[in-house]
């Protein structure tokens, strides 16, 4: 239960179809201020719906929390305290852990790399052993548990909505740093995050937005002298993913990547248009043949427990059991 009590809670329903608004009203009544969007405005649009209402109410600090995030009892209070004590910081976020592996880091800040035109999460999948700094000043943080000053919004605006989904928080943080304010990831504020929306499980929805908005970001902010290198990076990356998709029989993924690239270079933003997102056509044959080739398999986590768990679940879907192994070496 949250130990910090000096706050008001706004819940934004982003045009859900499962009866969530009625369920929230029935369970929480006046304890939360419910806002129901008439259409799905994406991650950034959903956040901004609530942020704009809260901003008009005059709050000095505003916070974004994803629906698939679970906050530690001190998460909100410690972010507020950190901002109170660090005037140079424009926004601060929790230290994020994997929901399915709570002892391992999902994000403790992110770097934006204009040398290789990518982002990097330095602490991804690291085990929490208590040796990390109390906080870090970083290029960007995840918006799944993020607090921002009202004065920061005055300078850089609300979250960029043209992305619809993905890269919106990265761009927001980039603008914060560019405006002369720091972005912090705070270790004393902890949150668990499922991160389910970023996995391809049904269709190529995450692939489209991740690729299009990745390209859009660097096209927008890369210095002119580096544009040729940037273009080479995009084309090489696209060739690799498309080639692998065609080779593995994942034609819809390859198609989505090419369409995302085309939309990006033509400046198309917002919600994906028609014929951009397709059902997955995953080719399971190579994996099934791998599992059938031996009587037993072992997985060495090698500090990547989340990936190891996904391999185990894949085998389980094929009807095979995989034994966990703590040896330094493993068969798989």
Which residues does each predicted region cover?
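Short, acidic, metal-binding catalytic loop of nucleotide-sugar glycosyltransferases
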Residues: 1-6
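A conserved acidic beta->alpha catalytic loop
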Residues: 13-22, 39
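Glycine-rich, basic loop-to-helix element that forms the pyrophosphate-binding segment
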Residues: 36-57
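Acidic/His-rich active-site region of diverse nucleotide-sugar glycosyltransferases
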Residues: 45-46, 70-156, 162
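Short beta-strand-to-loop acidic/aromatic patch adjacent to the donor-nucleotide binding site
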Residues: 59-70
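Active-site-adjacent helix/loop segment of glycosyltransferases
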Residues: 136, 182-265
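A short, conserved alpha-helix in the catalytic core of glycosyltransferases
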Residues: 139-158, 162-190
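Terminal low-complexity segments of carbohydrate-biosynthetic enzymes
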Residues: 212-213, 220, 235-332
């Amino acid at each position: 239960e949250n130990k910090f009590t000096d706050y008001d809670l706004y819940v934004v329903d982003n045009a859900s179809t499962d009866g969530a608004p009625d369920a929230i009203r029935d369970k929480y009544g006046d304890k939360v201020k419910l806002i129901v969007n008439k259409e799905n405005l994406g991650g950034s649009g959903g956040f901004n719906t609530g942020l704009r209402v809260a901003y008009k109410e005059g709050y000095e600090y505003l916070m974004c929390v994803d629906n698939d995030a679970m906050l530690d009892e001190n998460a909100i209070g410690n972010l507020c305290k950190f901002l109170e004590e660090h005037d140079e910081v424009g926004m601060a976020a929790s230290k994020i852990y994997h929901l399915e592996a709570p002892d391992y880091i999902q994000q403790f800040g992110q770097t934006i790399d204009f040398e290789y035109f990518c982002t990097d999460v330095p602490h991804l999948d690291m085990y929490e052993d208590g040796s990390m700094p109390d906080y870090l000043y970083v290029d960007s943080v995840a918006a799944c548990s993020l607090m921002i000053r009202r004065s920061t919004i005055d300078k850089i605006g609300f979250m960029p909505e043209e992305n619809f989904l993905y890269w919106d928080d990265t761009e927001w943080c980039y603008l914060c740093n560019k405006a002369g304010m720091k972005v912090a990831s705070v270790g004393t504020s902890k949150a668990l995050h499922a991160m389910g929306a970023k996995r391809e499980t049904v269709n190529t929805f995450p692939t489209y937005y991740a690729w299009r908005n990745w390209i859009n970001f660097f096209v927008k902010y890369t210095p002119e002298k580096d544009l040729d290198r940037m273009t080479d990076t995009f084309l090489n990356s696209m060739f690799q993913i498309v080639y692998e998709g065609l080779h593995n029989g994942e034609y819809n993924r390859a198609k989505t990547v090419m369409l995302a690239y085309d939309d990006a270079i033509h400046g198309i933003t917002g919600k994906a248009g028609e014929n951009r997102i397709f059902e997955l056509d995953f080719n399971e044959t190579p994996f099934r043949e791998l599992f059938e080739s031996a009587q037993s398999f072992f997985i060495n986590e090698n500090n990547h427990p989340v990936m190891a768990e996904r391999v185990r679940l894949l085998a389980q879907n094929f009807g095979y059991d995989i034994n966990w192994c703590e040896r330094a070496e493993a068969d798989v």
